[in-house]
């Protein structure tokens, strides 16, 4: 999980003013008791939800990159995440499952989860987030292969538009050894196990 330090940003005051204006434009009284601190709360929330822009996922992996001869699949599954859809700025959330096959180097397991957190803490589309996670691991560790599967519920589909509350979107991307159907199948079987 990303650290929960207090958000201090030069953008905070501007964001507060813009959110105050939005509340007024929606027809509400931004000065009434229940809404007085809402612009600041929302501004801080948005800065937290997008703090991935200020973090380097490659550096996170490099900070715990270890030489190791292990050459079988490493899977970190059921990584919970929240993100914001870049089209409506509504949340989407779910689980990421990430595997790689080392090629002389491994990384700390928590670093895989941190990479997911960094890319999910940006305005995103699920497809690009899946690709970014895969590319970051491939570029930094140079493994024999990487596979990422992301399953998510999108509030932009549940609260508005088609209003399909039970829909789940699944995306996947892979490189190297995962181009082989047998390797992909092994990964899929392993992430389905509970």
Curated annotation (Swiss-Prot):
UniProt key word Metal-binding: yes
Keyword annotations: GTP-binding, Hydrolase, Metal-binding, Nucleotide-binding, One-carbon metabolism, Zinc
One Pfam family this sequence matches: GTP_cyclohydroI
Catalytic activity: GTP + H2O = 7,8-dihydroneopterin 3'-triphosphate + formate + H(+)
Residue positions binding Zn(2+): 85, 88, 156
Pathway(s) where this gene product acts: Cofactor biosynthesis; 7,8-dihydroneopterin triphosphate biosynthesis; 7,8-dihydroneopterin triphosphate from GTP: step 1/1
Record's GO cellular component terms: cytoplasm
Keyword NADP carried by entry: no
Family: Belongs to the GTP cyclohydrolase I family.
Protein's name in the database: GTP cyclohydrolase 1
Annotated source species: Bacteroides fragilis (strain ATCC 25285 / DSM 2151 / CCUG 4856 / JCM 11019 / LMG 10263 / NCTC 9343 / Onslow / VPI 2553 / EN-2)
